[in-house]
Curated annotation (Swiss-Prot):
GO molecular function, one term: DNA-directed RNA polymerase activity
Site (Essential for primase activity): 492, 494
GO cellular component: a single term: host cell nucleus
Domain of life of the organism encoding this protein: Viruses
Protein name: DNA primase
Enzyme class, first EC level, given as a word: transferase
Subcellular localization, as worded in the UniProt entry: Host nucleus
Taxonomic source organism: Human herpesvirus 6B (strain Z29)
InterPro entries linked: HSV_PRIM
């Protein structure tokens, strides 16, 4: 059956209704595009609002072909009178289109009545059906804005999209047209009437290409499906074989598709699959199969496989700079933990300022002054400057206390009404924490990590007070000092929890053991001398906050017993001692080390499965704590909550994950975890420091605030472009214009007048009607900013704006603003001509782009 897609210049639903009732008005039916097939009938169709199985048109009435004589109208490109359509209407076929709808809506049985009467008495149903199901455009503008503004683009896109029932969008079909032919014909002006419009669509030379284009487009569609199926397979193969976190998995998918479909690669793919006139129509789109998927492997997957494989990651991406020398002369804290002689001083901020001022005064002429305050105290602690007096060295720090021969720790302690800062080099840590009594009652044999952790009962307290002696052992924080070498890696690890997470004891300890295994393997690659069977990693967990649940708590024996009832996050503190004789200098290597540990935690399959089931893993190690003056809570200490009655809560309690080498002497391991010097950044060690690590770099993402995925995303989205003013200068020089401009404004205006505007003006004269082109015969330019200029037309010495470039409005006043925008695209400029019109039909002052011209690519 021959199919005609048509339009009207009046409300199509009412025009169709009048035809169905055989009482036609004087309106016209405009055949837009026709698909011929020998038949006694002609189907008149409209585009549907929804398409099932890619069927995008449906019939609204059927005519007898012989009575209608459609070929006459097509050959003469003439509209069909509604009366002629009504007279040739095939009532039987047309009735079948509406009868079921009418009967289902009315609930009546079919009556023996002529269709025209049935239609007449159900006008509202038919009008509602037509307006609800079909698109009813009444001007050429809709077709041009939807399918394309050039003759070939319009017709080929419309024919394939409406008639071929293929799973291709309009945008995709337009792309197929551009791949099929470089010449898409002349511009079809939006101001044309419907009669002028069908004169173009029914007489176009592009109608001869319908069959060939449909064949090509189907082959292109199949090739695209095959290409993208292979690309999906390549992306999924790596995704399934790697152990990415959920967040990284999403990032990876976006990066992979954007890498494979990057502009130059996609343009190259389009060129390869473009229509080749040297090949038969049935053998198109068969060159370089799987080019996109293969390019992804070269440009991303091979890099990802190295970065997300632990062995390759450390060999390829991790760069560690070490300084080995037995005479390094750098020292960590000197801090005694079982001393009956207590040298701890407690000062407020004001008292520290006065103490530093006194030190500066006493050392005047001997030592350079330091800033008063906490930073000055940290500098004095780390300073090894001394003066020689009678064969005796007097260090600057001894002005604070005569026994301070080596660096000392500085702590922040929270009291009831204030913070104080404490420093010194000795205390009785074990006695004051009650560890001596705890160790007496520990079992001698190792049973399990869980049993050992349950066996520890720490002395507890709940309230803040102003007694420094008590609070020193409940709310102490170590202040980081990057001038002192780091002997323990202290990691602040927060794992945000999913809403549905249920954390049993078995799950939690399995997670901790896997974290230990992952981190110790990474430690072995950084420090090859360690023994992974004995080297300790100390875990602490922030106690769950049970205050919200205490009143409502009732034990249900059927419920799974949870080890952790935290709802927002699991807070862990992890301490990994560096090998004896080794230290890290400064905070920057620690930030990079935290990023590395973040990454390796995502590489273990078992650990990733647990983390993905409970948490939102990713950048979990906090790198903000490695700045001089920043502090971190020490293991066994409490949080303070001033809003809840000055309560202590969230204590860092020990979680014992005993290495295999200490299973026969678990008490020794517990004593190590109770040793404060294993829990401080700069803790005291037995061996002198002979190796100093001063740089650790992940070459895949050297910036501390960016992950590897973030860096790849930024490289994709923030494509590096040459500055606009630099490109302007290059274009002026390339075209032989001496740029003697004294400012960027002069360069921009010179570029537009000499290079940009002649190109735009030629485009306007070629593709726009005379009414529009003539407005640009005499113009001047006003600079808005470094990338935008406004155009004004000049007449008889007067400057004014333009009349609308899209439509001829009633009145048609000169109130339309026209601009040129410059956009950098790699090594070239794109010129965009756009305007704003206040009329409602022009979207009320919204941006209307008229042309976009890419200038030639500049040579590097």
């Amino acid at each position: 059956m021959t199919i005609v897609v048509f339009a009207t210049e009046y409300d199509a639903a009412n025009v169709i209704f009048s035809i169905l009732c055989r009482s036609p008005s004087e309106h016209l039916i405009f055949p837009i595009i026709v698909k011929y097939k020998p038949s006694n009938n002609v189907s008149f169709c409209l585009q549907t609002q929804k398409c099932k199985n890619s069927k995008r048109i449906d019939t609204v009435f059927v005519c007898h072909a012989e009575k209608l004589n459609l070929s006459h109208y097509i050959q003469t490109a003439s509209p069909i009178k509604a009366e002629d359509v009504a007279n040739s209407l095939n009532d039987k076929e047309t009735e079948l289109l509406y009868v079921d709808m009418i009967l289902s809506q009315t609930g009546k049985e079919k009556e023996d009545v002529e269709f025209k009467y049935m239609a007449y008495f159900h006008k509202s149903l038919i009008i509602k059906y037509l307006t609800g199901k079909f698109l009813l455009p009444t001007s050429p503008f809709w077709f041009l804005s939807t399918y394309g503004q050039t003759e070939g683009l319009l017709l080929l896109t419309m024919y394939y999209y409406l008639f071929e029932e293929q799973k291709s969008t309009i945008t995709t079909t337009k792309n197929y047209v551009q791949c099929f032919t470089e010449n898409t014909g002349s511009m079809v002006f939006t101001y044309s009437s419907m009669s002028e419009f069908i004169n173009i669509t029914l007489k176009s030379k592009f109608r001869k290409l319908f069959a060939d284009f449909a064949t090509y487009a189907r082959q292109k569609n199949l090739r695209d499906k095959e290409e993208f199926k292979y690309l999906d397979t390549q992306i999924n193969l790596f995704r399934k074989s790697s152990h990415l976190t959920n967040t990284f998995r999403v990032h990876y998918i976006y990066i992979a598709y954007n890498t494979a479909l990057e502009t130059t690669k996609f343009v190259n793919y389009c060129n390869i699959t473009s229509y080749d006139s040297n090949l038969p129509i049935g053998q198109q789109c068969q060159r370089n199969v799987h080019i996109l998927g293969n390019s992804l492997h070269e440009n991303l997957l091979c890099i990802m496989k190295q970065y997300f494989n632990a062995d390759c990651y450390f060999k390829t991406y991790i760069d560690i700079k070490r300084l080995k020398n037995p005479d390094l002369n750098v020292t960590e804290y000197e801090y005694a933990l079982a001393s009956k002689k207590k040298t701890i001083q407690a000062l407020t901020s004001e008292q520290i300022t006065r103490a530093i001022a006194k030190c500066n005064k006493n050392g005047e002429g001997l030592f350079s002054p330091v800033k008063p305050g906490l930073q000055g105290l940290l500098e004095i602690s780390a300073s090894d400057k001394y003066v020689q007096i009678q064969d005796k060295r007097i260090y600057r720090r001894q002005h604070l206390h005569k026994d301070y021969h080596r660096p000392f720790p500085v702590f922040r302690v929270q009291l009831l009404h204030k913070n104080i800062f404490c420093f010194g080099n000795s205390e009785d840590w074990y006695e004051n924490m009650g560890f001596n009594r705890i160790l007496q009652y520990l079992p001698d044999e190792y049973i399990s990590d869980e049993a050992l952790t349950r066996a520890i009962w720490l002395q507890d307290t709940h309230f803040l007070c102003d007694d420094f002696e008590k609070q020193f052992y409940t709310t102490r924080h170590e202040i980081f000092n990057e001038r002192i070498p780091v002997t323990n890696y202290i990691g602040d690890l927060d794992l945000p929890l999913q809403d549905t997470a249920t954390i049993t004891e078995e799950t939690f300890f399995s997670m901790c053991r896997l974290i230990r295994l992952t981190l110790i393997n990474a430690w072995k690659k950084i420090f090859p001398s360690i023994d992974t069977h004995t080297h300790p990693i100390f875990f602490f967990k922030t106690q769950c906050d049970t205050t919200n649940d205490a009143l409502d708590y009732t034990e249900d024996p059927t419920e799974i017993k949870q080890f952790c009832i935290c709802r927002k996050k699991i807070g862990l503190r992890i301490s990994i001692p560096l090998p004896n004789g080794t230290a890290i200098a400064g905070g920057e290597p620690l930030k990079q080390l935290s990023k590395i540990l973040n990454h390796v935690m995502c590489l273990d399959q078992e650990l990733s499965q647990i983390l993905n089931s409970l948490t939102f893993p990713g950048e979990c190690f906090d790198i903000g704590i490695y700045h001089t003056g920043h502090c971190i809570r020490i293991g066994y200490m409490y949080k303070t909550d001033m809003d809840k009655g000055k309560m202590l809560h969230g204590r860092l309690t020990p979680i014992f994950i005993v290495p295999e080498g200490y299973r026969n002497s678990c008490k020794t391991f517990i004593q190590m975890q109770m040793d404060l010097n294993n829990l401080l950044h700069h803790g005291t060690k037995k061996a002198p420091i002979e190796e100093l690590i001063y740089s650790i770099t992940d070459k895949g993402c050297p910036k501390e605030n960016l992950s590897f995925m973030d860096l790849k995303s930024r490289q994709l989205w923030n494509k590096v472009n040459i500055a606009t003013d630099t490109l302007i200068t290059k274009y002026l020089n390339t075209h032989g214009f001496n740029n003697n401009a004294t400012s960027a404004d002069d360069s921009l205006l010179s570029f537009i007048r000499l290079i940009g505007w002649p190109i735009i003006k030629t485009q306007l004269i070629t593709h726009y009607e005379t009414r529009i082109a003539q407005q640009f015969s005499q113009v001047t330019f006003l600079k808005i900013d470094s990338k935008n200029l406004q155009i004004k037309k000049t007449q008889f010495g007067r400057v004014s704006d333009f009349s609308c470039l899209n439509r001829q409005h009633r009145g048609n006043r000169d109130n339309v603003l026209v601009y040129i925008q410059l956009k950098a695209d790699g090594n070239r400029l794109i010129l965009i001509l756009w305007s704003t019109c206040f009329a409602t039909k022009c979207q009320s002052n919204s941006k209307q782009v008229h042309c976009s011209i890419a200038l030639e690519q500049l040579k590097n």
